[in-house]
Amino acid sequence: IGSEGTLGIITELPLKLIPAPKETISLIIPYENLEDCIATVPKFFMNHFQPQAVEFMEKEIVLASERYLGKSVFPKQVEGVDIGAYLLVTFDGDSMDQLEELTEQVAEIVLDAGAVDVLVADTPAKKKDAWAARSSFLEAIEAETKLLDECDVVVPVNQIAKYLTYVKGVSEKYDFAVKSFGHAGDGNLHIYTCANDLDEETFKKEVSEFMADIYKKAAELGGLISGEHGIGFGKKGYLAEFAGPVNMRLMRGIKETFDPKMILNPGKI
C-alpha cells in the first residue's frame, strides 16, 4: 500500500462492513476569509466533535460550480458581509435529537472563531444539493477552460491558510487562473490551474514553473507533493528534487530487490 503498484499488486482484500449511520446532518459554514475558515478546523477535533467530512472551498470555485449547475447553494453575503470561503461539514449519529444538540455546540464554537453563520442541511434535498455542488467542482472547472492542470498536495492542517496565501501570491505572476478546494480535516488540497486565453505551449511552460514553486513550498511547510492522487508520470519529474538523492537510492534499491525485472508499473522510479 502506497507504492503505487511498483512493488506488488493486491489479489485479495478482505473488507469489514460497518452499519450505515442512522442519521446525518451537514453544515455549510461561511467565512469572510480563508484564514478564519481554516483556523476553525482543529477546533472540531479539539472538542471531540468527530466530523465524518470537513471540506473547505474558496468563493471562486463555488461560483464556478453554481454556473455549471445553474443552482445557488452557498451564500455569497450574510448580513452585509461578503463571504470568501466555506466549510462543508458532515456529522452522523443515532438520532436527529443528538445531531441537533451537536449542531448547537458546533455553532457556538465556529461563530466564536469567526464564522459568519451556520446553515443546516438537515433534509435529504438540502444535503443532496450541498454535496452535489461540492462533487461538481472538477466538472465545473473543466466546463470553463480549454486547458487545466492540478496540484494535489498535502500540508499540515495548521499550514493550509499560509500555503494557499502563498499559492495565490505566486499565481499572480502568471496569466492563468487558480481555483482551490480540499479536505480540510487532513490538509489534502486540490489546486487547479486554468489556462484562460493562454495557448497550450505557454500554459505548459508557466504551469511547470508554478508547480515547481508551490511543490517546494509544500515541502518547506512539512507537506508532501501528493496527497491522494499519487506520483505516476505527472509528478515523476518533481519527485527526485522533493525526496532527495538518498531517498531515491533507497526506493530504487527496494524496487530492484522486489522487482528486479521491472515488471510492475515500470518507469515510475
Briefly describe each language-model feature range.
Residues I1-G227, I231-I269:
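Noncatalytic alpha-helical scaffold of FAD-dependent oxidoreductases
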